[in-house]
Amino acid sequence: MAVITMKQLLNTLFVTSEDIYLSLEGENVLANRDKTVVARYPLHTLQAIISFSYAGASPALMGKCAEAGIGLAFCSPHGRFLARTCGESSGNVLLRREQYRIADDPARSCEIARTMIFGKLSNGAASIQRTLRDHAPRVADCGLEKAAANLRAMLPQVLAAADLDSLRGIEGAAATAYFDVLDHMLLSRKEAFFFHGRSRRPPLDRVNAMLSFAYSLLAHDCASALESVGLDSYVGFLHRDRPGRQSLALDLMEELRPCMADRFVLTLVNNRMLRPEDFQMQDSGAVLLSDDGRRKFLKTWQERKQDTLTHPYLGEKLSWGMIPYAQALLLARCLRADLDGYPPFLWK
């Protein structure tokens, strides 16, 4: 059972317990557990419902939501998007049309992409600062302070980037500065867990294998979040269209990489939660998680998503697993012009 059963956020009801069945009573949505009503919410206060429960919802509620223009989305308990219900006309049509218009306008795309990359650099610096704070004696002379300062110094450049190509150049320089010191943030069993640069296809060491797997899981969660709020995960602003690539999911995950994926991998290594034996060395030089290692990784990833924090913009206590959904909601509100701009997730 999830830590939080129900959470109303930005006029969206999140059902995060997997044994909750949703039904309709008059103009109210009822949350039922074992045929007992545990909560009720007036439908007129909601714009959307996102359920992470396999128990489902009544046809009457689905019909009422479709009639009232309330988005009803279903995800697995682990966050995989399954389906949405909508009526004959839906605000999602207007939302997606605006998304496509912005994606076709480089200047407007850059405006949103700037804030996402601002979040990525800010969170990268925060991750480095956390290592400095938690392990000060061991990492005092490793260049971490300088790297964090360099990332922070690039933040004004990000906001001033004139176009997407300039923004990508700044992001690339920041990624180099960040990954140059990542090895100094790995503090356990250095003979097995080291990082000498990013290698993707295939990953060539254990840390790159974990980073690639974490990024894949995070991209999946971001895509599910975007689809659940009615956005097209394949049409991005920073990452341009490419067949089969969920470009908007890649956009959204940029600001979340340092705090949700990279910090997770650092925790696995520094807390000795995975062993060197949990990886397989291929004849091609690729390094992959073994079946047992993948199971451990996934179990710990899902546990991490249940940890809670206070969202820095919303001021609400949320689980880490809800952060992509909160950001997807904020992005949708930005595209609808309910917000002056997109507020990135800024970790502290």
What is the predicted role of each segment?
Residues 45, 53-126:
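A surface-exposed, charged beta-strand/loop segment in the N-terminal or early-internal portion
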